[in-house]
């Protein structure tokens, strides 16, 4: 708990703390009295110890002349020995002059001896503790969430290792945003649809919490392709990207006391982070590298219990690049039914299939167990900054209506943010008019890059890729640390690689697999070849002395 000290007649009863006659100020617009008391937020005490209100400065004779004015100089400036503090106004958060007429910095008032101690509490001989009724997570779980379960946070940490003004450009192979490369520009039909929606002037308003009806209908029609029944607009909830879809679903499931959720390992860390913030217990099932990163179905029933509410599958898979077969997904649905749980199907990479295995929507099995599918424009249309996604309900038996899950999602969205109205308005035209040639071109680029990635990884004995990527934008790679000198783990590897080679990778630890890394191949082939070449050079420089470079 935080403690505020009180001494020498100095009272601390508000947001800020006043310093005593020895002249220390705590900084946030609060001045010290000579013998006096400060009553809170931005209040200066006069020379005789009187406080004159909110943000009101006293003159040298201890008189107050109004709201944020000192010695009647009209601009809120405090005077002492005939000097002013310029624009440092003594009016709440502003700055006042000290006893010698000199101005201090950053909203701090100096006292009789002119010393400032920032935001610290006043030093005192007598102490009085204040017990505050608020605090962060006592167990440290939430405090660690941002650092340990966030790709963004770990990417910033690793990027900080890059040498400033290095001889070579930084190659970001840590996250899936190829929009920075001109070759991955979105479809012209998508750009035109957004521009047209803006030009109408009709979509500058707030939308409905669950989304514009026309946009929801368009998504429902789009997602009904390939499933044995039609979705309606009521089956679709629009969100601010796939990330918000996760932020909506997890709290809804966490409303049941003692509930837990089954997550894949490796997996996308936002699920675990959101579960931690909502105190939803997480239990992991493994993906098997030697079986194309298939789900370890046999383990599902052993880790689930009566409090298990749902399981997450990611298909096509991030971070592994796998694409699941019809038979495999069917088995998952049957297990989910036996357990009485719903399936959350993260399908944001549904259009990005690179091999011969087709993408099978989990909604095909909605008649077996209820499915909440997460999708977005971000990946397939290469527009992550547009922030438009959805949650689609595949539930022909209306189980999620009966259990109030759909109602809870609606209620959550009614008190949450919305995707931009003009993007929603453009959505029907984007879905209808984007030509198949656009997707073929994007998939062609990704396929070429994935081939390069897999080939060059195979030529580097210090890393291992157990399965060629078949979809999404990523591949998981094992670090053969026993061949490397003074590399402690995957995070150490990534930080040193960034420092020496200006290549940014995602450590596997944040994805649930220590001593692995995730590489994105969603970039132009020449940059990818350069990056993989730098990785090999780094490994060769840091190899153990008795290790050869032969593959």
Curated annotation (Swiss-Prot):
Listed GO biological process terms: biosynthetic process; tyrosine catabolic process
Task: Say yes or no: keyword Transferase present.
Answer: yes
> Which species does this protein come from?
Hordeum vulgare
UniProt KW keywords: Aminotransferase, Pyridoxal phosphate, Transferase
Signals that turn on the gene: By iron deficiency. Only a trace amount of expression is detected when sufficient iron is present.
Q: What class of enzyme is it?
A: transferase
Q: Which SUPFAM superfamilies match?
A: PLP-dependent transferases
Start-end of Low complexity biased regions: 111-123
Residue(s) carrying N6-(pyridoxal phosphate)lysine: 379
Q: Which residues form a coiled coil?
A: none
Organs and tissues of expression: Expressed in roots, but not in leaves.
- Give GO MF terms, alphabetically: L-tyrosine-2-oxoglutarate transaminase activity; nicotianamine aminotransferase activity; pyridoxal phosphate binding
Name of this chain's protein: Nicotianamine aminotransferase B
């Amino acid at each position: 708990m935080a403690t505020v000290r009180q001494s020498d007649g100095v009272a601390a009863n508000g947001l800020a703390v006043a310093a005593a006659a020895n002249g220390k100020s705590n900084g946030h617009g609060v001045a010290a009295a000579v013998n006096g008391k400060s009553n809170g937020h931005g209040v200066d005490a006069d020379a005789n110890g009187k406080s004159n209100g909110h943000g009101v400065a006293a003159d040298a004779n201890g008189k107050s002349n109004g709201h944020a004015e000192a010695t009647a100089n009209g601009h809120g400036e405090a005077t002492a020995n005939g000097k002013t503090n310029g624009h440092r106004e003594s009016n709440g958060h502003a700055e006042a002059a000290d006893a010698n007429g000199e101005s201090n910095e950053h909203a701090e008032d100096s006292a009789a001896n002119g010393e400032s101690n920032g935001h610290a509490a006043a030093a005192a001989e007598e102490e009085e503790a204040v017990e505050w009724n608020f605090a962060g997570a006592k167990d440290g779980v939430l405090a660690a969430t941002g650092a340990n379960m966030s790709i963004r946070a770990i990417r910033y940490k690793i990027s900080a290792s890059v040498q400033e003004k290095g001889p070579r450009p930084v190659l970001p192979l840590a996250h899936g945003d190829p929009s920075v490369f001109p070759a991955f520009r979105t479809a012209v039909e998508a750009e035109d649809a957004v521009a047209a929606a803006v030009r109408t002037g009709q979509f500058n308003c707030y939308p409905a919490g669950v989304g514009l009806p026309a946009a929801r209908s368009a998504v429902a029609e789009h997602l009904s392709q390939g499933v044995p029944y039609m979705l309606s607009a009521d089956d679709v909830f629009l969100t601010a990207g796939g990330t918000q879809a996760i932020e909506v679903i997890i709290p809804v499931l966490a409303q049941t006391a003692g509930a837990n959720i089954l997550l894949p390992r490796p997996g996308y860390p936002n699920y675990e982070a959101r579960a931690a913030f909502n105190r939803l217990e997480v239990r992991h099932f493994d993906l098997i590298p030697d079986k194309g990163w298939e789900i370890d179905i046999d383990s599902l029933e052993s880790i689930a219990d009566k409090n298990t509410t749902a399981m997450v599958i990611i298909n096509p898979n991030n971070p592994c690049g796998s694409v699941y077969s019809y038979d495999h997904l069917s088995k998952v649905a049957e297990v989910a039914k036996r357990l009485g749980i719903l399936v959350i199907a993260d399908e944001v990479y549904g259009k990005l299939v690179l091999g011969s295995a087709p993408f099978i929507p989990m909604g095909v099995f909605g008649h077996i167990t209820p499915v909440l599918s997460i999708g977005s424009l971000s990946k397939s249309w290469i527009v992550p900054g547009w922030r438009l996604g959805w949650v689609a309900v595949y539930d022909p038996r209306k189980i999620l209506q009966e259990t109030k899950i759909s109602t809870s999602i609606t209620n959550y969205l009614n008190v949450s943010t919305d995707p931009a109205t003009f993007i929603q308005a453009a959505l029907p035209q984007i879905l209808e008019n984007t030509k198949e040639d656009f997707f073929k071109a994007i998939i062609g680029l990704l396929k070429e890059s994935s081939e390069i990635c897999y080939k060059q990884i195979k030529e580097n004995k210090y890393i291992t890729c157990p399965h060629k990527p078949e979809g999404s934008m990523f591949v998981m790679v094992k670090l053969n640390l026993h061949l490397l000198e003074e590399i402690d783990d995957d995070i150490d590897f990534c930080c040193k690689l960034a420092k020496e080679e200006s290549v940014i990778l995602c450590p596997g630890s944040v994805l649930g697999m220590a001593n692995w890394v995730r590489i994105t191949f969603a970039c132009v082939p020449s940059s990818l070849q350069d990056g993989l070449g730098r990785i090999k050079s780094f490994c060769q420089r840091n190899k153990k002395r008795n290790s050869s470079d032969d593959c």
